[in-house]
Amino acid sequence: MSETICALATAQGGAINVIRVSGEKAIETVSRIFIPKGGEPLEQRRSHTVIFGDLCTNGREVLDEVLVTVMRAPHSYTGEESVEISCHASSYITQQILLSLLDMGVRQAEPGEFTMRAFLNGKMDLSRAEAVADLVASTSRAAHRLAINQLKGGFSHELGNLRNKLLKLTSLMELELDFSEEDVTFADRAELMQLCEEVDEVISRLAGSFSVGNAVKNGVPVAIVGETNTGKSTLLNALLREDRAIVSDICGTTRDTVEGLMTLSGVSFRFIDTAGVRETHDVVERMGIERTLEQLAKSSIALWLIDPTADAEQIEEIARKLLPICKGKKLAVLVNKCDVVDPISLSKAMEWGMKMVGKYGEGVEWEERDLWAISARQGTNMDRLEEFLVCSSAMPAIAAGDVVVTNVRHYEALVRALENIKEVKTGLAGGLSGDLVSEHLRSAIRNLSEIVGEVTSDEILGNIFANFCIGK
């Protein structure tokens, strides 16, 4: 990490751009192109001071009037010597500053490299580093609150407590191994089992929170399904209030899933417009239909659209394929195009929709009130749909300090640790030898340590930080 790096840290479109520079020669390098308007040179300034002056390139040609913030190691975001240059948000000015830095030997930062350096320099553990990306990507109050809680170390604190209990268990087991010939007991099996139960309970709670955390972070998944040409893409566009999906009278226009995020009453939803389900010999369309069924299986809420002009056999064929997959999911049955069909056809379609849920919808979370007519094109009864979505999300209130798992990597590590603890409990109950029980305990500790980055490979680190933006 001896190289000095730089990158634009702000998004395009504002009035000011911030260029971040970090590394051993950050202050020295910037001082070569920055002339303070009064006071000491940049290299003599104390940490966390902001200096006004001219940024010069091409000899001493003034490029812009800027503010330069100096942060000295280890009291910076990265833990290194750091400078932030706040300039006017001209793309030309920004480009010239970056080119000047590159000409002086500074390297363009890789995605997430500033945060990776913060992690490697001990400024934050890996779970808190990942929270930085979640904070930047947050689109709702709940997602923001979870990211802040993790960034402040709430999750790390929980993991630290778990690791301490596991270390206590391991040390007791290994002490007995060291004194096995002297028949010394450092803890009875009942006490060890009680400690295991406590650890099991906490890990289970954390792992169990992932379904909520993932929905908060990525949006509650809502699958829009039905036969071809029922208005699924029109409904997606109406929900998002923008033309995201292509709408056409030609059957099979949507051949792959189209997604969009929307926040309703503080809850983020991820709507998935899917390919229409029908019998087809088109290979590409069949692949799209298979993906429809996959997305439906992964969703929490399903919106089944029915075309009121379809006959009973068509409706039943679709219901037979879709409704069994909706088991355990919230379902709304929406008879679309109420603005263009006669009341009799509309009534028959609604009647058939209700019959099909009764016939094929075993285990589906559905009530008769969850069936109604809409016009996705005209917006008829869309307010009722939005109310249904918010009520169906069942998103618990998240308070400051709540620890909820939002990251797939963390969840998978917790599941592995939980399996290790169950092996320990089985071993203790069955009289398994102490060395084998200790090995399961050490595996649990390794899995928890992987979350905070204490035993993480370079490949995993690379994958994590590659998902960050350049300036982070």
Please provide the spans of the model-predicted regions.
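Switch I (G2) and immediately adjacent beta-strands of P-loop GTPase domains
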Residues: 51-72, 252-280, 301
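A glycine-rich (often HGG/GG-containing) alpha/beta subdomain
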Residues: 1-145, 149, 153, 325, ...
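Conserved G/P- and acidic residue-centered "switch" motifs that form tight phosphate/ATP-binding loops
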Residues: 122, 229, 273
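The start of beta-strands in P-loop NTPase/AAA+ ATPase cores
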Residues: 15, 243, 268-269, 302, ...
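Redox-cofactor binding/interface segments in oxidoreductases and associated redox assembly factors
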Residues: 304-306
